[in-house]
């Protein structure tokens, strides 16, 4: 709708959601597709390369990045937290460029973390179609299970949950999960 409102002709922008391997297979095998560009995991990259090799398809890949968010001691902490929240929670962090790690210089850590948590607590969880909502559900049950498993593993490895770490109260339908902030996460 937004694209049409901005004058973009129908068919120029198309969003596909569903089973990534089957979608990729259909796109790669199509004679219409002339170039493939992907940002994703090494596993998915290998699958796409194998499929693209049959057609000698042009491919560009950015694989297995960890999108660090770095804050130095000369940073404007208010601006840094605003940018961090926008980057991290866009589409519930389900974007390949969403920061996975935050590296904060020690003398700014407490100030950054406290303000980041304060602002994150104000994010509204709910129906993603509601304009007042900042955080909708995760995309699939599988993704929800992966997030729950990741949180449990991270806690077992000694990280401390500073915020979230569970499904929000009152959201029994859908794949909702609270924004979660850890401290003392292992470097690997």
Which stretches of residues belong to each language-model region?
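Beta-loop-alpha module in the N-terminal Rossmann-like domain of NAD(P)-dependent dehydrogenases
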Residues: 19-26, 40-47
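Short, surface-exposed connector motifs at secondary-structure boundaries
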Residues: 7-10, 28-35
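A broad detector of the eukaryotic-type serine/threonine protein kinase catalytic domain
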Residues: 18-21, 32-33, 68
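Surface-exposed charged/polar residues within alpha-helices that form helix-capping/stabilizing sites
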Residues: 5, 25-26, 50, 149
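PLP-dependent aminotransferase-like
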Residues: 1-24
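ALDH superfamily catalytic-core signature
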Residues: 35, 41-187
